């Protein structure tokens, strides 16, 4: 799938250098879909990713969750807690931020794909 089919592209222009759409930030590596669980004032969001992990001893799956800190560009400031977003790996932006929010997922996109 192409990126434009998964996310809603930003409608407004921004002057953020760390924006993957309007700035000079290159996205490479892993892409994850997750839920925004916390939004800070300093352009930071915390994303929760839920995955299934196979336990061979019990022959069952268990849910495991990972929380990732990501950078939120100015043009995507309408994203709020509870929204599902797509994030991409990039160069280290700070001590804890190595991912950037690419956009809000469109309705009907499954999180497990």
UniProtKB/Swiss-Prot annotation:
PROSITE patterns per the UniProt record, alphabetical: RIBOSOMAL_S17 (PS00056)
InterPro entries reported in the protein's UniProt record: NA-bd_OB-fold, Ribosomal_uS17, Ribosomal_uS17_arc/euk, Ribosomal_uS17_archaeal, Ribosomal_uS17_CS
Keywords: Ribonucleoprotein, Ribosomal protein, RNA-binding, rRNA-binding
GO CC list: cytosolic small ribosomal subunit
GO molecular function: rRNA binding; structural constituent of ribosome
Pfam families per UniProt: Ribosomal_S17 (PF00366)
GO process annotations (BP): translation
Keyword rRNA-binding: yes
PANTHER family named among the record's database cross-references: 40S RIBOSOMAL PROTEIN S11 FAMILY MEMBER (PTHR10744), 40S RIBOSOMAL PROTEIN S11-RELATED (PTHR10744:SF9)
HAMAP family noted in UniProt: Ribosomal_uS17_A
Quaternary context: Part of the 30S ribosomal subunit.
NCBIfam families: PRK08572.1, uS17_arch
Function: One of the primary rRNA binding proteins, it binds specifically to the 5'-end of 16S ribosomal RNA.
Annotated family: Belongs to the universal ribosomal protein uS17 family.
Stated name of the protein: Small ribosomal subunit protein uS17
Species of provenance: Nanoarchaeum equitans (strain Kin4-M)
């Amino acid at each position: 799938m192409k990126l434009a089919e998964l996310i809603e592209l930003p409608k407004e222009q921004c002057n953020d250098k760390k924006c993957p759409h309007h700035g000079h930030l290159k996205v490479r590596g892993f892409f994850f879909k997750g839920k925004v669980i916390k939004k800070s004032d300093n352009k930071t969001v915390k994303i929760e990713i839920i995955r299934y992990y196979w336990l061979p001893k019990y022959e069952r799956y268990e849910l495991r969750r990972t929380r990732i800190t990501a950078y939120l560009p100015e043009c995507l400031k309408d994203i709020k807690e509870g929204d599902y977003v797509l994030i991409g790996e990039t160069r280290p932006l700070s001590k804890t931020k190595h991912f950037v929010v690419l956009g809000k997922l469109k309705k009907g996109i499954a999180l497990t794909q």
